[in-house]
């Protein structure tokens, strides 16, 4: 847990999400899982109710979400990496997703040099037409980079294999 202002960075994230109304939080844990559980407890200190799902082997970003499916299959859900520090209004992003027919919405941001990120090309209706994870210099077709923040409809689970290492950016998009 990386400390920021005398708190683990994930505590800032949980507080931010709870302040926006995302109070039921599922955290998939593997590496440093015990430290994360000790730091956050049940989440009540941060205005949240936290459920932990252990990952015995590395399953990747989408695989770990699939591993937590039983806690996420009732409604669309937000996916945010535990190492994210953001002040983005993810509630607005969530609401935009709810108003669309999309199975998944990917948070995008315009940046100067997108080589270290997944990039997307969108059409006039904001639908993603192409996505490439960490493009080589000759493969860059957009400066819209993935934030690694997604809103997923539970239908997404139909596209993620069980007990398999599977990443949103590399394997699903």
Give names to the regions the model predicted.
Residues 1, 119-122, 173:
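A structural signal for short hydrophobic beta-strand segments in well-ordered beta-sheet cores
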């Amino acid at each position: 847990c990386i400390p920021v202002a005398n708190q683990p960075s994930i505590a800032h994230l949980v507080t931010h999400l709870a302040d926006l109304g995302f109070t039921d939080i599922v955290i998939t844990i593997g590496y440093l899982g015990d430290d994360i559980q000790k730091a956050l407890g049940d989440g009540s200190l941060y205005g949240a109710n936290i459920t932990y799902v252990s990952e015995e082997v590395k399953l990747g970003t989408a695989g770990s979400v699939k591993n937590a499916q039983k806690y996420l299959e009732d409604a669309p859900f937000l996916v945010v990496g535990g190492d994210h520090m953001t002040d983005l209004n993810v509630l607005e992003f969530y609401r935009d997703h709810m108003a669309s027919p999309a199975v998944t919405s990917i948070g995008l941001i315009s940046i100067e040099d997108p080589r270290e990120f997944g990039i997307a090309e969108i059409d006039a209706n904001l639908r993603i037409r192409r996505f490439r994870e960490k493009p080589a210099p000759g493969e860059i077709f957009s400066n819209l980079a993935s934030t690694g923040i997604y809103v997923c409809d539970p239908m997404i689970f139909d596209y993620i294999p069980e007990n398999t290492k599977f990443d949103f950016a590399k394997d699903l998009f």
